[in-house]
């Protein structure tokens, strides 16, 4: 698995630093020569001591009978730990940096452990050291200096030439550990130690180093990047004094635990950052978890030698190093200069590949018993899984390489490219991704239904720009039919196996490049074929290829004809077989079209029809000369044309079971409480469009849909003139009625704006129909020439749409013919610069806006009201004393200011 791209820069810096601190080939050769010479000399010393002991004991055995002659490399005289239990010197083993392969440039101290049969003594150490000088002269021409260090229980061997290497040979025995375990268990020792025995703690430390070397070879050497990170951190411990206490076994154990617990192999940069994260977490702190030593029977902390201040200093330094690495300054942690972002192209030079894991080959003089039995190549008990793997490897070598797409080709040519997501458009079910990549200071962009497909298209563009093959040529040269059609095999033509194989290879290659296999209708071929022929069975005909590039051939029989398809898996092969059957048996199959969905009527735009191209003059809120619309759904629970209300009335479900928010086509705001909600008559006003009420007046005025008193916005009358209005006969002569005036008017409780031509005649109709207008206040409008009565809405065309707020009194209608006649004979005047309306009725208070009562004269037959234009709104309810008996109500004045 390749490292993550976000750590590529860190990997480059870590590997560059590692190449600097790694020892040169000359240094490694010098270490190898000194170690091998010492091992061969110790083997000769062991033979000499064993021969002397046999001569002294009188035994007549030939100690060398089972051994072959020693060659120059010392490969034939191997002494293993378990094979020579009677020898005084049982074997020599590499430990420390030599065994673990952690040598750095400038490391001059090497270690070996010499195992003894009995507890090592001072006399044994001197005998070995004295004879070792003689054996060096016979083994090698190089001169070595041998020094005895009894206090440390070791023999020091120094080289006399450059580099001045030092090799420490530690003497120990497994009996020292066994006696320690017995003492800890409370047992008494029956055998007394010799008086000149070496220091027990030094011997135990040598045994521990031997266990550490075995554990490291088994756990850390095979872990990717672990040895490299340890070498880099060993250099850090040398350069930074804060890290010095961590050097050695604790550092090795910590790196193995941090890197080995990852869920995937990591590069050198990512592995180093993971170790820094582990240290930064506070694992070294006194209250931390500590570090368990796996090479000890009893639970022990490998960090117990660290002091509290040292733990805090190392943790703080690791946190600082982690911050630097996070901000792209890992070179400061490594103590090196930053590398350029783009490395210059270098000519390829054949250099030997260096194995950074193994620095020095294993010893051949004293061979350690292997941790596991070697695989017997010719044995009958060879694992069958091993055989299977070898067979698969042979098959993989013999098969052609896997077909590469454009993205794979580009990654081979330009590794480490960064693909960026530019945009994501389209709906959720069909998104379109746009990816870009920068190659050689050029930016390429492409789109696709997924990020992966978009990246593939970008790679195709890059390869085309470079003039390199993209892997799509075969698909472009051939037609779609020749690519996707598998060979059809009928029972009468069974000799098409070669053609099937060639088509199978083409299908497999095109499948990898084209993505999912779909029919011309965008469906899965197997699903579409199953819709036409149920119960089809797909059979596997053949399976070829290696484990990494399988080829499957599937066959299906449809209507007595067999169709085959091939692919890299059974699913793809089935799809191509079904696709072949569809194209052969159903070539003219039309695409399935869904049933047309029920279209909703167009919603009325906000703001009403004032945005329409054609409407009545003035501030109207209704369309002119427009037919009634279809039923429109709103947000309420009403009828077909739902409004905001909850009524279940007819079209234009209203606020209180009738009326609606924009109930009419013109969009009047009707808030009515009438229980007689019904279908509004659009053409009840003699064909005039607008919100005409059911059975409305004979003129084309704007009024409410429903029966009841309407709320109109008439234009204000002219200033006060003490002149009586002309009789109805004269008005009829002066202004002829409209075309629809001849129709007999229907009785209605509804009255809105009157037409400009039928104003006077409608005044008479109002007197006959006993129309009740309530709560009328006007909107802005031009002044009219004709005066309107108190019981009429302001006459004239040109005023805008009306806001109808009706309450629809349906009970207790008193005969007001006398009252209406008396009111119409009165005189009224209003001085105002804004719209004003004065109305007197039996049940509705008159609204005056803006006006205040100046003087009220109550007479038996006349009511006079004068209002100034600069006062606030007042509401009057005037009932003359002469009408009290007729109306049965009381008179009063109500001021709402």
Curated annotation (Swiss-Prot):
Subunit text: A component of a ybx2/frgy2-containing mRNA-ribonucleoprotein (mRNP) complex. Also a component of the CCAAT box transcription factor (CBTF) complex.
Gene3D superfamilies: 1.10.1410.40, 3.30.160.20, Beta Polymerase, domain 2 (3.30.460.10)
Chain's gene name: ilf3-a
Top-rank taxon: Eukaryota
Start and end residues of each DZF domain: 5-379
Tissue-specificity statement: Expressed mainly in the ectoderm (at protein level).
GO molecular function: double-stranded RNA binding; mRNA 3'-UTR AU-rich region binding; mRNA 5'-UTR binding; sequence-specific DNA binding; single-stranded RNA binding; transcription cis-regulatory region binding
PANTHER family on file: INTERLEUKIN ENHANCER-BINDING FACTOR 3 (PTHR45762:SF4), ZINC FINGER RNA-BINDING PROTEIN (PTHR45762)
Swiss-Prot/TrEMBL keywords: Antiviral defense, Cytoplasm, Developmental protein, DNA-binding, Methylation, Nucleus, Phosphoprotein, Repeat, RNA-binding, Transcription, Transcription regulation
GO cellular component: cytoplasm; nucleus; precatalytic spliceosome; ribonucleoprotein complex
Ranges for region Disordered: 52-85, 364-403, 466-502, 627-650, 708-797
Compartments reported by the entry: Nucleus; Cytoplasm
Pfam family, one: dsrm
UniProt name for this protein: Interleukin enhancer-binding factor 3-A
Disulphide-bridged cysteine pairs: none
Biased composition (Gly residues): 637-650
Function of the molecule: RNA-binding protein that plays an essential role in the biogenesis of circular RNAs (circRNAs) which are produced by back-splicing circularization of pre-mRNAs. Within the nucleus, promotes circRNAs processing by stabilizing the regulatory elements residing in the flanking introns of the circularized exons. Plays thereby a role in the back-splicing of a subset of circRNAs. As a consequence, participates in a wide range of transcriptional and post-transcriptional processes. Binds to poly-U elements and AU-rich elements (AREs) in the 3'-UTR of target mRNAs.
Modification after translation: Phosphorylated. Phosphorylation affects nuclear translocation.
Chain intervals with Low complexity compositional bias: 749-794
Compositional bias ranges of the Pro residues kind: 714-747
Biased composition, class Basic and acidic residues, residue ranges: 72-81, 373-384
Species of provenance: Xenopus laevis (African clawed frog)
Motif Bipartite nuclear localization signal boundaries: 372-390
């Amino acid at each position: 698995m390749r490292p993550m791209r976000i750590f590529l820069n860190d990997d480059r810096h870590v590997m560059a630093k590692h190449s600097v601190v790694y020892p040169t080939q000359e240094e490694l050769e010098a270490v190898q020569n000194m170690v091998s010479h010492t091992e061969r000399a110790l083997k000769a010393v062991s033979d000499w001591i064993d021969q002397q002991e046999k001569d002294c004991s009188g035994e007549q055995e030939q100690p060398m009978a089972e051994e072959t002659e020693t060659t120059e490399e010392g490969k034939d005289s191997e002494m293993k730990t378990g094979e020579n239990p009677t020898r005084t010197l049982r074997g020599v083993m590499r430990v420390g940096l030599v065994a673990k392969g952690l040598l750095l440039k400038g490391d001059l101290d090497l270690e070996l452990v010499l195992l003894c049969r009995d507890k090592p003594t001072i006399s044994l150490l001197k005998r070995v050291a004295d004879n070792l000088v003689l054996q060096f002269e016979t083994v090698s021409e190089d001169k070595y200096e041998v020094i005895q260090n009894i206090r440390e229980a070791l023999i020091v061997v120094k080289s006399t030439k450059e580099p001045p290497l030092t090799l420490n040979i530690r003497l120990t025995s497994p009996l020292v550990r066994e006696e320690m375990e017995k003492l800890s268990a409370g047992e008494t020792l029956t055998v007394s130690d010799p008086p000149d025995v070496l220091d027990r703690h030094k011997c135990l430390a040598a045994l521990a180093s031997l266990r550490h070397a075995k554990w490291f070879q088994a756990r850390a050497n095979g872990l990717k990047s672990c040895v490299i990170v340890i070498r880099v951190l060993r250099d850090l411990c040398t350069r930074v004094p804060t890290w010095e206490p961590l050097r050695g076994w604790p550092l090795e154990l910590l790196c193995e635990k941090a890197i080995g617990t990852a869920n995937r192999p990591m590069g050198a940069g990512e592995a180093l950052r993971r170790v820094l994260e582990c240290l930064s977490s506070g694992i070294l702190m006194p209250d931390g978890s500590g570090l368990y030593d796996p090479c000890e029977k009893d639970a022990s902390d490998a960090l117990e030698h660290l002091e509290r201040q040292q733990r805090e200093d190392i943790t703080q330094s690791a946190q600082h190093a982690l911050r630097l690495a996070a901000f792209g300054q890992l070179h400061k942690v490594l103590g090196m200069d930053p590398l350029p972002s783009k490395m210059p192209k270098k000519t390829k030079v054949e250099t030997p590949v260096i194995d950074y894991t193994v620095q020095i080959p294993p010893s051949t003089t004293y061979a350690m018993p292997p941790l596991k039995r070697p695989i017997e190549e010719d044995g009958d008990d060879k694992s069958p899984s091993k055989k299977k793997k070898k067979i698969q490897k042979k098959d993989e070598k013999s098969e052609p390489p896997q077909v590469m797409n454009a993205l794979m080709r580009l990654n081979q040519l330009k590794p480490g490219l960064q693909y960026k997501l530019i945009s994501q458009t389209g709906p959720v079910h069909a998104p379109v991704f746009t990816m870009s990549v920068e190659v050689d200071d050029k930016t390429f962009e492409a789109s696709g239904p997924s990020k992966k497909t978009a990246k593939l298209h970008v790679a195709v563009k890059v390869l085309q720009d470079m003039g390199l093959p993209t892997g799509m040529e075969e698909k472009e040269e051939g037609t779609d039919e020749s690519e996707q059609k598998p060979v059809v095999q009928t029972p009468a033509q069974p000799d098409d196996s070669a053609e099937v194989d060639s088509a199978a290879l083409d299908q497999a290659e095109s499948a990898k490049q084209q993505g999912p296999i779909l029919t011309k209708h965008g469906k899965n071929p197997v699903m579409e074929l199953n819709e036409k022929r149920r119960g089809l069975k797909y059979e596997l005909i053949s399976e070829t290829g290696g484990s990494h590039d399988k080829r499957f051939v599937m066959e299906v029989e449809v209507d007595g004809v067999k169709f085959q398809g091939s692919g890299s898996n059974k699913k793809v092969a089935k799809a191509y077989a079904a696709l072949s059957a569809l194209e052969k048996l159903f070539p003219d199959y039309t695409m399935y079209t869904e049933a047309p969905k029920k279209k909703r009527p167009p919603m009325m735009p906000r703001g009403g029809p004032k945005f329409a191209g054609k409407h009545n003059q003035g501030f109207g809120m209704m369309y002119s000369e427009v037919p009634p619309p279809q039923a429109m759904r709103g947000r309420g629970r009403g009828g077909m044309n739902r409004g905001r209300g909850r009524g279940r009335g007819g079209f234009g479900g209203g606020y209180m079971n009738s009326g609606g928010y924009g109930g009419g086509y013109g969009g009047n705001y009707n808030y009515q409480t009438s229980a007689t909600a019904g279908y509004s008559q659009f053409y009840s006003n003699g064909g005039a469009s607008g919100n005409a009420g059911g059975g409305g007046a004979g003129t084309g005025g704007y009024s409410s849909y429903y029966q009841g008193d309407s709320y109109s916005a008439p234009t204000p009358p002219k200033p006060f003139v003490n002149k009586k209005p002309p009789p109805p006969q004269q008005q009829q002569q002066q202004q002829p009625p409209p075309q629809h005036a001849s129709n007999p008017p229907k009785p209605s409780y509804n009255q809105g704006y009157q037409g400009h031509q039928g104003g006077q005649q409608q005044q008479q109709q109002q007197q006959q129909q006993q129309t009740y207008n309530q709560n009328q206040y006007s909107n802005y409008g031009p002044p009219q020439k004709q005066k309107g009565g108190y019981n009429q809405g302001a006459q004239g065309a040109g005023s805008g749409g009306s806001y109808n707020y009706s309450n629809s009194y349906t009970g207790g209608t008193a005969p007001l013919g006398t009252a209406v006649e008396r009111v119409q004979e009165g005189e009224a005047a209003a001085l105002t610069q804004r719209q004003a309306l004065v109305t007197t009725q039996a049940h509705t208070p008159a609204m005056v806006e803006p006006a205040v009562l100046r003087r009220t004269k109550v007479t038996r037959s006349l009511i006079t009201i004068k209002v100034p234009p600069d006062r606030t709104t007042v509401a009057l309810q005037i009932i003359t004393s002469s009408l009290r008996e007729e109306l049965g109500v009381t008179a009063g004045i109500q001021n709402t200011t």
